[in-house]
Curated annotation (Swiss-Prot):
The keyword Cell membrane does not apply. Binds 1 Mg(2+) or Mn(2+) ion per subunit. InterPro entries: IsoCit/isopropylmalate_DH_CS, IsoPropMal-DH-like_dom, Isopropylmalate_DH. SMART domains: Iso_dh. This is 3-isopropylmalate dehydrogenase. It is found in: Cytoplasm. Belongs to the isocitrate and isopropylmalate dehydrogenases family. LeuB type 1 subfamily. The gene is leuB.
Length: 381
């Protein structure tokens, strides 16, 4: 059934293609989002901004003020990838990756969500035994703005005797722990209602406060089962039996490490999306993988993480869960048909490039419902 044009809701999305393979995977992601929007009955108004190396080349700034303003005025930010080895010699504040910190700060983002779900068709791609990884479906919720990356004092200091000393400070306030805990509990409530909080409360005072506050917030969610693990044990358990986890909540440094460990359970980082959220305003949705400059422009990139990041955008920022489900089902259908990009290819499968993988996903969407579909040659404008 068609939707009357007057009833169609329009969302403003900021697209930040960035560097390396970013423009290629962004083209696929936008086409898929436009296609599913046409099916479900809403529209996307795209605005393009510069970020990372591309922004530095054009403006001398990896995050130009106009890009941040555009992001702040949008309903969601769809990001591809930033960075290139050629920028490694730039001053730290000019490097492409610094744009991500500025974007998160400018949008007030404090919660990073990384879903880790293995498609049945890719169980063999994992380095772990199939019986260990089959059925994995967990989310790592990482606090983004506190902890040792931001605590003060920090730096390298020289004492009176001329000896240098490096200092970083891991610190969290009650308010910071409470707000990230509520994000994790709300997410767990919508899933299997199990939350595991990861800390190092046996030796770190900051973790003792973390555990105390998470336990206190748990009283607001009696329907969610809370458990605690020390981070070293959590790292071991993720490899030993990852299916025990539903939602993992942890602080910045621990989350940085555990989310990458969890990512590799699936066999390819090219499959994994992420979301960074705040209390209000637009979230940022991006693949976990980097810009892969070594394969940029060669049609070799895997666009699936970008596509699945779009599904998260629909679910968390636009409140369009039906559209998100359609995208995820289309990706699974294409994998079931045996199509693989190089990073997930195995013998007997059909090797395709970035663009063709996108076309296959669009075709799978079209099979779900006979509606006008997007095209990779003309993503929405």
């Amino acid at each position: 059934m068609s939707v009357p044009s007057s009833a169609v809701r329009t969302y403003r999305i900021t697209a930040l293609a960035g560097d390396g393979i970013g423009p290629e995977i962004m083209q696929v992601g936008r086409a898929v989002l436009d296609a599913v929007a046409a099916q479900v009955g809403f529209s996307l108004q795209w605005q393009e901004g510069l970020i990372g190396g591309a922004a530095y080349e054009a403006t001398g700034d990896p995050l130009p003020p106009e890009t941040l303003k555009m992001a702040q005025e949008s309903d969601a930010v769809y990001l591809a990838a930033v960075g290139d080895f050629k920028y490694d010699t730039l001053p730290r504040e000019k490097r492409p990756e610094r744009a991500l910190l500025g974007l998160r700060a400018g949008l007030g983002l404090f919660a990073n969500l990384r879903p880790v779900k293995i498609f049945p068709q890719l169980v063999q791609a994992s380095s772990l035994k199939p019986e260990v990884v089959a059925g994995i479906d967990l989310v790592v919720v990482r606090e983004l703005t506190g902890g040792i990356y931001f605590g003060q004092p920090k730096g390298i200091f020289t004492d009176a005797k001329g000896s240098r000393r490096g200092v970083n400070t891991m610190a969290y306030s009650e308010a910071e722990v409470d707000r990230i805990a509520r994000v994790a509990f709300e997410l767990a409530r919508k899933r299997r209602r199990k939350l595991c909080s990861v800390d190092k409360a046996n030796v770190l005072e900051v973790s003792q406060l973390w555990r105390e506050r998470v336990t206190a917030i748990a009283a607001e969610y009696p329907d969610v089962e809370l458990s605690h693990l020390y981070v070293d044990n959590a790292a071991m358990q993720l490899v030993r039996w990852p299916k025990q986890f539903d939602v993992i909540l942890t602080e910045n440094l621990f989350g940085d490490i555990l989310s990458d460990e969890a990512a590799m359970l699936t066999g390819s980082i090219g499959m994994l999306p992420s979301a960074s959220l705040g209390s209000s305003g637009p979230g940022v949705y991006e693949p976990v993988h980097g810009s892969a400059p070594d394969i940029a422009g060669q049609d070799k990139a895997n666009p699936i993480a970008q596509v699945l990041s779009g599904a998260m955008l629909l679910r968390y920022s636009l409140d369009q869960p039906q559209a998100a489900d359609r995208i995820e089902q289309a990706v699974e259908a294409v994998l079931a048909q045996g199509y693989r990009t190089a990073d997930i290819y195995s013998e007997g499968m059909t090797l395709v490039g970035c663009r063709e993988m996108g076309e296959k996903i669009l075709a799978a969407l079209a099979q779900q419902q006979a509606s006008p579909q997007g095209s990779l040659s003309a993503p929405g404008g």
